[in-house]
Amino acid sequence: MRVITLSGITLFLLASLASAIELTFKLENQEKQCYYLDSFHTGEKTHFTYAVQSGGSFDVDYMIKAPSQKTVALGKKRRQADVFFTLEEKGEYEFCFDNHMSTFTDKIVTMEITMENELSLPALTRDEAKDYKKDSMQSTVLEISTALSEIDRVQNYFKTREHRNYSTVKSTQARIFWFSLAESIMVVALSALQVFIVKTFFKRSGRRGV
């Protein structure tokens, strides 16, 4: 089992904090990989998503565990998953992927974890706090951030579909090639068998005539 600790780039946008981690890795046959993410705050909204890009039936098992070993989410033989949850504990969250159902096939998996946490406003008077909340620049930045996140999610979706379709096309081409080769060998073998039968028939007929 392979264990990796994740670290991401944290972006501060005015009164909100968002961090995102994206990783593409190879999950070999009969292998289990676990990734660990440190949570220093509770209440953070987290979005976990993954998709199998190529390999076999494009499916793996996954499991998310809290620091207390409580199961947050799990799935069996899933091609992809979108999980939204809130970090309720401090410590290491565990994200595991299991490919034990595949005896020979390796998988390419893309995983992304996005966390958002609203920070408390600075100590201001009531009127200043109202003006701060209504600040148009903050609203614009938050709207742009939301729109960019949605665009990124859509792009990842189409990228995953493209990888899967490409892998399916390659697999189909390989099957067509081997099927055509086997068919050609069978045609040649049947032709040779027919020639052999005809020759044998005429040889026997010639002997009887003599």
Curated annotation (Swiss-Prot):
Leader peptide range in chain numbering: 1-20
Single GO cellular component term: endoplasmic reticulum
Native source organism of the sequence: Schizosaccharomyces pombe (strain 972 / ATCC 24843) (Fission yeast)
Taxonomic lineage: Eukaryota, Fungi, Dikarya, Ascomycota, Taphrinomycotina
Name recorded for this polypeptide: Uncharacterized membrane protein C17A5.08
Gene Ontology BP annotations: endoplasmic reticulum to Golgi vesicle-mediated transport; Golgi organization; intracellular protein transport; protein retention in ER lumen
Cytoplasmic side: 197-210
Record membrane topology: Single-pass type I membrane protein
Family recorded in the similarity comment: Belongs to the EMP24/GP25L family.
Domain GOLD span(s) in chain numbering: 32-115
